[in-house]
Amino acid sequence: MILLADPDPGSRGELRTVLEQAGHVVTAVATGLEAAQVLMQTVPSLLVIDLDLKWLSGRQLIELLRHNPRTYFIPIVALGGRVEDLRGIPLLLRPVVPRLLLAQVDRFLTGASHDGGHL
């Protein structure tokens, strides 16, 4: 299961559709708090997190995940509006190009060799 956290309903729906059409099971949420609640109940295969989530930003969520032995290993793809250093986590700039998102997802979920993105 991929956990998608995106505050924009239109973008969230579009990205969810792209991922589902590629054969992935997706749980989509709008806030960092909702993402944290999902993560307390299940461990997804991959996180796609917007950096500008409400009530718990994407950056804060990433830091929490890095310090939790239950979640530190989950790969992350970040979404954002500007280039930032996320210490090895791939960042897709908005507007997200679907093929680039799918390339990152496939990179992590197919076990292909990579050099970052894990917590």
Place the predicted regions along the sequence by residue.
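Acidic, metal-coordinating helix/loop segments flanking the phosphotransfer/catalytic sites
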Residues: 28-46
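Two-component/phosphorelay signaling modules centered on CheY-like receiver
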Residues: 9-27
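Acidic di-acidic motifs
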Residues: 6-7, 94
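C-terminal output helix
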Residues: 96-117
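A short, hydrophobic beta-strand element within the central beta-sheet of small alpha/beta folds
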Residues: 72-83
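Conserved phosphotransfer microenvironments
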Residues: 50-67
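Residue-level signal for the "D+5" position in two-component response regulator receiver
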Residues: 28, 55-56, 95
